[in-house]
């Protein structure tokens, strides 16, 4: 029984250490030796408990993002009958809370950005477990706000614009940009949520007249009509 408890503890330490090392270095540059050293485990521990570094990486993904879903659900606890505006604000706040979390969960945002910048075989797992649920939710919200005549590219552009405003805070594991470090984090989070929400709704309102005025335009073209004349 004691041996089993020790094994579970070692596995837990490896997952915690791997989350930090993968977040800081990415999958390719992180070494099994470094992870084992950080976990204070022997060099064979990863193969024993997970089978390989790749399988450990997959477990880190599953654990981190299940934790994110449990702690900060994308729907913010709202019912399905909530307005599109309310669902948008809840989703923005959920993403910001995940990115600005100063606990070990904050490493999850860094891992996402590392994976998107330097894709590995795990990218499919990222798409399935992290990106796809967010994409479906944000596209549904945006389409409801822009209107049924919107081309798919317009929905995609708006959704990406909103999401990346939130992801930009995920680079430093919960640490704020230097110019914002003196501010109370919870107060700032509320203000950021409101700002990104209002900024995004304003952008969608600016796109909506183009959608309604030019239903015949090829997909995506009307987004750029104002710039190119």
State what each model feature region is.
Residues 1-9, 209-229:
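N-terminal intrinsically disordered/low-complexity leader segments
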Residues 2, 13, 21-55, 59, ...:
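Helix-turn-helix
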Residues 8-16, 49-77, 124-128:
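An amphipathic alpha-helix adjacent to DNA-recognition modules
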Residues 15, 85-92, 189-197, 201:
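Short, amphipathic alpha-helical "lid/cap" segments that border enzyme active or binding sites
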Residues 53, 60, 64, 88, ...:
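Hydrophobic/aromatic residues within well-ordered alpha-helical segments
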Residues 73-107, 155-159:
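Hydrophobic alpha-helical connector segments
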Residues 107, 111, 123-132, 141-197, ...:
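Hydrophobic/aromatic-rich alpha-helical bundle segments in the mid-to-C-terminal region
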Residues 113-119:
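Short helix-capping/turn signature of helix-turn-helix
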